[in-house]
């Protein structure tokens, strides 16, 4: 749901935070998200500052997806150990959370702010929702306790239903509140609205009507938000977005 929101996958040509600043200047209401910032490749102080800045400039519309990264070739370029990304992710996650406090003072793998200085601006609501992507090299219980939501990958409906049920059970066992589940979906939208689904990488080539049915199935199993990716879309992107806005968005947005 929430198909009116805009998510940018890290790995675009543009730096995600620069791109978010541009989107903030050209939009007014839609949520802006990134899926996801690879925390071990960036210093968490810079992430906390950039994310808070984008949030303030957008009027509190930023949703921050975070991940440990899955591309081994990126780590040597920054002289960072790929096999330590899980621990570095966890430390970065905790560092970012603490930096949004007033005059933070704490010990961390990435540095030790001593309380004599502060980071400005702060996010509009005091902190940003951090949505953990995939496993991020973490224990599932840690993800359930610490993330404000979870971004996962497309799967068959039955398998996805089991995974979402397990995640929500872990949240409940930890005494946590309800949290949103997000999944990505690559879509190549067919001109024929009734065109049957044909698998593509992490998604389908299909018509509007099967897409609507599929999204309804995801909603039924507890997926709250689907990030549609048009990378493989063969039709004009502008006209495809218009079709989605007119035929799909009214049935799912804001629910």
Predicted regions and their residues:
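Active-site-adjacent structural elements that line small-molecule/cofactor binding pockets in enzymes
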Residues: 1-255
